[in-house]
Design a protein with these regions (language model features):
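Substrate-positioning beta->alpha
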Residues: 217-221, 234-256
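N-terminal Rossmann NAD(P)H-binding glycine-rich loop of SDR-like oxidoreductase domains
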Residues: 3-33
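Glycine/proline-rich active-site loop of Rossmann-fold NAD(P)-dependent oxidoreductases
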Residues: 188-189, 203-221, 256-267
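Active-site Tyr-X1-5-Lys
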Residues: 154-192
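NAD(P)-cofactor binding segment of oxidoreductase domains
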Residues: 74-77, 92-124, 176, 254
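Mid/C-terminal beta-alpha module of Rossmann-like enzyme folds, strongest
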Residues: 240-241, 251-302, 333-336, 343-348
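Conserved C-terminal active-site "lid" loop/helix of NAD(P)H-dependent oxidoreductases
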Residues: 247, 302-324
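NAD(P)H-binding glycine-rich loop region in Rossmannoid oxidoreductase-like domains
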Residues: 37-38, 42, 46-103
Length: 348
């Protein structure tokens, strides 16, 4: 499949900006969907490309939210939908997690059917490992997750829990389920590719002028391994989700999902493998000497994970999409250096 005109949602985000960069570098024409003109202006500053235009969609859950954005001459060949919340912060109601993910996904698929059914041949959706399996737990001893797995989290769990992790897992699971159900029921002319990454780390491609503007995963790295409040004696933080992927590899998977005909109607797990807090700390301390005095030391060289910690099978992504993964040392050393630069720029 060779696509030339692409609609990309969430283009101003951590993952979306890398996808946008790789699409433009591959000579795609892209319409970026963002929530406000100010966000469009920021993205334009980062990507002054004549192959980029914008659509403003303030509320991706509103009926017909994407209809105007999907009108294009030349028409769109493909759509990449990345817009969804990843905010582990207090919300007044768990619908704040669920609605943008589920309704945003169904709205864009329905919009394609209404407005661009004759031209769109492929839709790529960014889901999450959260829709597949455990989230920072080791209770699935020796489990090797595959794209056939689904998290057991129910909708009732999500609406009644006080655990934001459960609400987030549900938002990803039911948004993705809605997409597959739509394809099965409506039988559209387009096919569907879903990408399921775990924790996403790596250098930023979009403008971030303050530490407080970091996405959640990179903010975690800053707070636990880079922030000046830490010392070598600071206790090594819990591992959290121990599967990860470099943001650039995830973005490349989105690009390949457009380019490879055989990827259609497939779900791809994407992870470079396991990583522990100890391994991240070891890399930061070794590769960024100026941070040695403020990165927890722990037990250098230790794996920092149980031998039975779960893993995932990424062979389909490697075979079908041709994905190779960035070395762990490169991912975390480049990120740590960039975080120190942001910190210095804001005078912290």
């Amino acid at each position: 499949m060779s696509s030339s005109r692409v609609l990309l949602t969430g283009a101003n985000g951590f993952v979306g900006s890398h996808i946008l960069s790789q699409l433009l570098n591959a000579n795609f024409s892209v319409r970026a969907v963002v929530r406000s003109q100010s966000k469009a202006n920021t993205v334009r500053g980062d990507f002054p490309s004549p192959s980029l235009d914008f659509a403003i969609v303030p509320d991706i859950t509103a009926p017909g939210a994407f209809d105007e954005a999907l009108k294009s001459h030349p028409p769109f060949d493909a759509v990449i939908h990345t817009a969804s919340p990843f905010l582990y912060r207090a919300v007044s109601n768990n619908h704040e997690f669920l609605d943008p993910a589920i309704k945003g996904t169904t709205e864009i698929l329905q919009g394609i059917q209404r407005v661009a059914a004759s031209s769109v041949k492929r839709v790529v959706i960014t889901s999450s490992f959260a829709a597949i399996g455990a989230f920072g737990q080791y209770d699935d001893a020796n489990k090797v997750y595959t794209s056939a797995d689904w998290t057991p989290t129910t909708l009732d769990d999500a609406l009644t829990t006080t655990d934001l992790g459960i609400a987030y897992r549900a938002s990803k699971k039911f948004a993705e389920k809605a997409a597959w159900d739509f394809v099965a029921t409506e039988k559209p002319a387009f096919d569907l590719v879903v990408l399921n990454p775990p924790m996403v780390y790596g250098p930023l491609r979009h403008t971030v002028s303050q530490i407080g503007e970091l996405n959640e995963s990179n903010a975690r790295i800053y707070n636990l391994f880079v922030a000046p409040a830490n010392t070598p004696e600071t206790p090594m933080p819990p591992n959290g989700v121990h599967l990860y992927v470099d943001v650039r590899d995830l973005a490349h998977a989105h690009l390949r999902a457009l380019q490879v005909p055989e990827a259609g109607n497939t779900r791809f797990l994407l992870t470079a493998g396991q990583v522990s807090s100890q391994q991240i700390a070891d890399i930061v301390r070794a590769e960024v000497p100026e941070l040695e005095s403020r990165t927890p030391k722990g037990t250098p060289g230790a794996k920092g994970l149980p031998e039975t910690a779960f893993t995932a099978d990424v062979s389909p992504a490697q075979k079908v999409l041709g994905i190779t993964f960035t070395p762990m040392r490169e991912t975390f050393s480049e990120l740590a250096r960039q975080l120190t630069e942001i910190e210095k720029a804001q005078g912290q």
